[in-house]
Curated annotation (Swiss-Prot):
Family per record: Belongs to the uroporphyrinogen decarboxylase family.
Keyword set, alphabetical order: Cytoplasm, Decarboxylase, Lyase, Porphyrin biosynthesis
Subcellular location: Cytoplasm
Organism: Prochlorococcus marinus (strain MIT 9215)
Molecular function GO terms recorded: uroporphyrinogen decarboxylase activity
Organism phylogeny: Bacteria, Bacillati, Cyanobacteriota, Cyanophyceae, Synechococcales
PANTHER family in the record: METHYLTETRAHYDROFOLATE:HOMOCYSTEINE METHYLTRANSFERASE RELATED (PTHR21091), UROPORPHYRINOGEN DECARBOXYLASE (PTHR21091:SF169)
InterPro entries: UROD/MetE-like_sf (IPR038071), Uroporphyrinogen_deCO2ase_HemE (IPR006361), Uroporphyrinogen_deCOase (IPR000257)
Protein name stated in the entry: Uroporphyrinogen decarboxylase
Gene responsible for this protein: hemE
Length: 346
């Protein structure tokens, strides 16, 4: 049975593998010409991510180009929001805009319970097609946004530099925010279960903005709700590996390890050797490579990959970037990342 599992899934489960698996956050996207050409034909991000044929095609673009060990669903962390009654749009140069930001009790009480098979059936379609067509040549990954990050978007109404609106709610009306976070935790847990049933073999939780919290506030507003999502998933799918990623996580790594996840995805602001000492040995590590290195020459990319890998010693490790690959990254440098990553050996 172990031989039939794809490499990334085997590694995530802690099985013995010959090399670390490699994939990239945002591996399908703007740095690829084939994606930019498709975007010209379909300028709406929501159409690209919610039309199952387009989402499937985009998800597969990097698989055809680079053969990564993971194929991640092309979607967005905000995709489940309309199913809860929160509408949004993604403007190309500005990012997400929430049409009616959530800022009072009445709005929170009127949120719908998410029914993924009803409002997100296109996601299920894409994942089941990926699982069938990738055929265990790679691991199919699903993903969600964590409650704190979703709340940050819906309260602020858009991306924010200082998060003053959600922090104002956190410190003036914490009960209100906890109600919103709890709603999101239940809905996101259900959404992840739906992704797994549809074909996702490994799932990643993005709490992109939890790094904006002090460790003390992380313990109040982020960690408990990450754990609630994980608990909901693990109750039904105890064997499915769960990865947690936070941007700017250096101050909360130990706390991340207490949420029940299997793998911590590191950004590049922490030394991976130090992180290995701070994270319990049973928990795997992913990422840590600065995406900016992919603007360098091939030798510097290879050297950084080698240095990062060598510091992980005998840890369960998945080669990835410390953030999504950046727009404008030369495609041949992404190719180097994947090719060199596959040459690593234990």
């Amino acid at each position: 049975m172990g031989q039939d599992l794809p490499l990334l899934l085997s590694a995530a489960l802690g099985k013995k593998v010959n090399r670390p698996p490699v994939w990239m956050m945002r591996q399908a996207g703007r740095y690829m010409k084939i994606y930019r050409d498709l975007r010209e034909r379909y300028p709406s991000f929501r159409e690209r991510s919610e039309n199952p044929e387009l989402s499937y095609e985009i998800s597969m673009q990097p698989f055809h180009a680079f053969k990564p060990d993971g194929v991640i669903l092309f979607s967005d962390i905000l995709t489940p929001l309309p199913g809860m009654g929160i509408n949004f749009e993604i403007i190309e140069s500005k990012g997400p805009i929430i049409e009616d930001p959530i800022r009072n009790l009445n709005q929170i009480e009127n949120l719908k319970e998410l029914n993924p098979s009803e409002s997100l059936s296109f996601v299920g379609q894409v994942l089941s097609s990926l699982k069938k067509d990738v055929n265990n040549e790679a691991t199919v990954l699903g993903f969600v946004g964590a409650p704190w990050t979703l709340a940050a978007y819906v309260v602020e109404g858009k991306s924010s530099k200082n998060y003053s609106l959600i922090k104002s709610m956190a410190f003036k009306e914490p009960g209100l925010l906890h109600k919103l976070l709890d709603h999101f935790a239940k809905s996101i847990g259900e959404y992840l279960k739906y992704q797994i049933k549809s074909g996702a073999q490994v799932v990643q939780i993005f709490d992109s903005w939890a790094g904006q919290l002090s460790p003390e506030d992380y313990d109040i507003f982020a960690g408990p709700y990450q754990k609630k999502v994980v608990d909901i998933v693990k109750a039904e799918h105890p064997e499915t590996p769960v990865i947690l990623y936070i941007s700017g996580s250096a101050g909360v790594i130990e706390r991340m390890a207490k949420t029940g996840i299997d793998i911590i995805s590191l950004d590049w602001t922490v030394d991976i050797e130090e992180a290995c000492k701070r994270i319990p040995s049973g928990i795997g590590i992913q990422g840590n490579v600065d995406p900016g290195i992919l603007f360098g020459n091939k030798e510097s990319i290879k050297e950084r990959i080698d240095n990062t890998f060598n510091k992980t010693k005998d840890r369960k490790y998945i080669l990835n970037l410390g953030h999504g690959i950046l727009p404008g990254t030369p495609e041949e440098n992404a190719q180097t990342f994947f090719e060199h990553g596959k040459k690593l050996t234990y």
